[in-house]
Amino acid sequence: AIDCKTVDSALLPCVPYLTGGGTPTTDCCKKGVTTIKDISVTTQQKDACNCVKAAANRYPTLKDEVARALPDMCKVKLDIPISRTTNCDAI
């Protein structure tokens, strides 16, 4: 099973970017987005999606459009979107 704490700690270096925009840090891309990618390629994509969505919802100032752009900004292909409004059942 996927531990949401892993997702939370992976996204931590990305919080300044997710709430403020600009450019994500190397830590955010290398540790954060890559960790989520590694988790989401398992058979537990729906669980990973729910963890990412829950983490996103903990930050009321998170900018959804910035969050959705994060994988592209880091040049990482993610199968699950980083968003507060993702329908994880559709994944």
From Swiss-Prot:
Q: What UniProt keywords apply to this chain's record, in alphabetical order?
A: Disulfide bond, Lipid-binding, Transport
Tell me where on the tree of life, at the top rank, the source sits. Answer: Eukaryota
Q: In which tissues is it expressed?
A: Detected in seeds (at protein level).
The positions making up the signal sequence are none
Tell whether Transport is among the UniProt keywords.
yes
Pfam family for this entry, one: Tryp_alpha_amyl
Q: What does this protein do?
A: Plant non-specific lipid-transfer proteins transfer phospholipids as well as galactolipids across membranes. May play a role in wax or cutin deposition in the cell walls of expanding epidermal cells and certain secretory tissues.
What is the protein's given name?
Non-specific lipid-transfer protein 1
| Protein's organism | Trachyspermum ammi
